[in-house]
Amino acid sequence: MFDLNQSLFLRALRRQPVERTPIWIMRQAGRYLPEYRKVREHAGDFLNLCKNPELACEVTLQPLRRYALDAAILFSDILTIPDAMGLGLYFAEGEGPRFTNPLQDTKAIHTLKIPSIPESLSYVFDAARLIRQEMPKELPLIGFSGSPWTLACYMVEGGSSRDFKRILNLIYTEKEAAHLLLNKLAVSVTAYLIEQIKAGVNAVMIFDTWGGVLTPQNYKDFSLAYMHQIVQQLKKEYPDIPVILFTKNGGQWLEWMAETGCDALGVDWTCDLASARKRVGGKVALQGNLDPAVLLTTKNCIRSEVGSVLASYGYGTGHIFNLGHGITPDVPPENVAIMIEAVHEISPQYHL
């Protein structure tokens, strides 16, 4: 039987030797694929798709059928936890995620209940079990969650935001309430990731999409501290499950992030991979960091930029190729194939 620990992805995460650089893509199950759009249409809306284990399994497997990827990522959404807390998640056409019951005052934070994760989010774990059963046995499955800070941003703002005025006002004027909210979320995220691991995921990733809007000190206090808490708890219970942290626009804080005990850091395209490796490569693996916009260009440009990312990381293991953020819906599927082929062709020279 194939030992999953021998997969390229898990070996690279643990900084063990590999024959070539592994690759997967953030949002690899998504709207750029015509087969995904068909299933989403059948589901009625995005949330129905997330909450139907059979359909979530199908869209998770779609990119694996089309491309030679080195891992699958569970199809879900980062806002499942706030939804389970009773905030009433819905997706407004053209506006992204919204909540019918956002946290409008400190009283709402004090009365917010930590949900029973195994029951309230059973559809996520059912999907994970089904995916693990149906997907190729030699490929790892990645589970994920939003970071407490990122979830809090959506919960206080009521959805996406351009300026994060409400949540920033909260951390400056109501520190105690902000920490109470973040702690409730850290407890929930930890339980959520543990249930995903029990359901069969082989690595987990924490997406801190909005950590980059904070000052350095506030990042430490209101985002990193809670991710650290989660990593420590996960490592206590599941020391062999790799944990990846990703703060968008967080390249200036890699050293702090590497101190959490995580196994890898995702880096976006604004961060130089060579200098990131010099700074933290002795402690963690690095994942990234092709600019997603490159996938809207030409074959030659894609191959050239893939080559630049691989050269920037340089020789040896500890690199997982990915985009610097999620793939966009307007990417031609054939351009994804060009990127993957380029990684397969160019990367072996860095692993001789």
Curated annotation (Swiss-Prot):
Sites annotated Transition state stabilizer: 77
Pathway as given in its UniProt record: Porphyrin-containing compound metabolism; protoporphyrin-IX biosynthesis; coproporphyrinogen-III from 5-aminolevulinate: step 4/4
Record keywords: Cytoplasm, Decarboxylase, Lyase, Porphyrin biosynthesis
Binding site for substrate: 27-31, 77, 154, 209, 325
Top-level taxon in the UniProt lineage: Bacteria
Subcellular location(s) of the protein: Cytoplasm
Keyword Lyase: yes
Gene Ontology cellular component terms for the protein in this record: cytosol
InterPro entries, sorted: UROD/MetE-like_sf, Uroporphyrinogen_deCO2ase_HemE, Uroporphyrinogen_deCOase
Main location: cytoplasm
GO function term, MF aspect, one: uroporphyrinogen decarboxylase activity
A GO biological process held by the record: protoporphyrinogen IX biosynthetic process from glutamate
A Pfam cross-reference name: URO-D
Catalysed reactions, semicolon-separated: uroporphyrinogen III + 4 H(+) = coproporphyrinogen III + 4 CO2
Catalytic activity, EC: 4.1.1.37
Class in the EC hierarchy, top level: lyase
Family membership noted in the UniProt record: Belongs to the uroporphyrinogen decarboxylase family.
Subunit text: Homodimer.
Function: Catalyzes the decarboxylation of four acetate groups of uroporphyrinogen-III to yield coproporphyrinogen-III.
Record's protein name: Uroporphyrinogen decarboxylase
